[in-house]
């Protein structure tokens, strides 16, 4: 993870690390990972903003706002302001969750906004403009991307420092990685040259079976020499699948379960990466 600093007089201000949690395939545990990694980082004492960048509003619903269409301000509202050069007030549209993270919610209006982005000048960078005012208020900003490679996902990749890719431990999910990696490379070349791949996270794993071990070995063998594959994997669990309906994170719903422990370890692994990058960035800023 990359942490950038800027000087304000004699004070160095830290900018949030922005992570796009993305996979164009649905059902990979993307929303679950965004929510629980964010709350795991908050449990480590970090200030975290989650951004629901999916018109389905899955992250919004999963975090307990069961009627996203009734929310007065969502990501669509803020991106429309950016498109029309209207000011966005500090904290506008931000919801506060009981588990210590903030959320910019989404609903179906975001689908209509994605269509209008096509005719917008600087269309790939509207989300980046929305986040401009928040990036010095948080340690981490996590973007839950839509399961497609459309304009909203491109906006997320254009705004991000890194992308984290959850991949379900199945053969077809592993095969779909190549298309996403090509999109990341294209965004890096044309829009955001600083974009890095945070890593591939294996989700819904079951290494008790030969098949599960084969998929793990397949992905690590195919990509591990070029891209980080997180040591920590997220095991399959019925309890984890129940959290969305409960409107709670895995830490609140099943705090002693294996999935909670896995996300806790993932947060520590991610934080260790951030600490290393922070040290390097501080040395370069001197």
Annotate each predicted stretch with a short phrase.
Residues 1-286:
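P-loop NTP-binding core
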């Amino acid at each position: 993870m990359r942490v950038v600093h800027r000087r304000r007089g004699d004070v160095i201000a830290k900018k949030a690390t922005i992570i796009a949690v993305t996979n164009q395939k649905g059902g990979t545990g993307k929303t679950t990972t965004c929510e629980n990694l964010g709350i795991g980082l908050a449990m480590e004492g970090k200030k975290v903003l989650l951004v629901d960048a999916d018109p389905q509003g899955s992250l919004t619903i999963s975090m307990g706002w069961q009627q996203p269409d009734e929310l007065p301000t969502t990501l669509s509202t803020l991106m429309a302001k950016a498109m029309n050069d209207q000011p966005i007030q500090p904290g506008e549209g931000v919801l506060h969750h009981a588990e210590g993270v903030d959320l910019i919610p989404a609903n179906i209006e975001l689908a209509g906004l994605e269509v209008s982005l096509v005719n917008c000048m600087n269309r790939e960078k509207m989300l980046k403009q929305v986040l401009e005012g928040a990036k010095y208020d948080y340690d981490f900003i996590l973007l839950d991307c839509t399961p497609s490679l459309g304009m909203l996902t491109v906006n997320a990749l254009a705004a991000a420092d890194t992308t984290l890719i959850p991949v379900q431990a199945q053969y077809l999910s592993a095969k779909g990685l190549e298309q996403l990696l090509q999109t990341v490379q294209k965004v890096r070349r044309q829009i955001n040259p600083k974009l890095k791949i945070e890593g591939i996270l294996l989700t819904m794993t079951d290494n008790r079976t030969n098949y599960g071990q084969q998929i793990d070995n397949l992905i690590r063998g195919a990509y591990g020499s070029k891209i980080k594959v997180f040591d920590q994997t997220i095991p399959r669990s019925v309890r984890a699948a129940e959290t969305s309906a409960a409107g709670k994170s895995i830490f609140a719903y099943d705090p002693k379960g294996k999935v909670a422990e896995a996300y806790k370890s993932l947060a520590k692994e991610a934080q260790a990466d951030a600490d290393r990058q922070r040290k390097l960035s501080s040395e370069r800023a001197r």
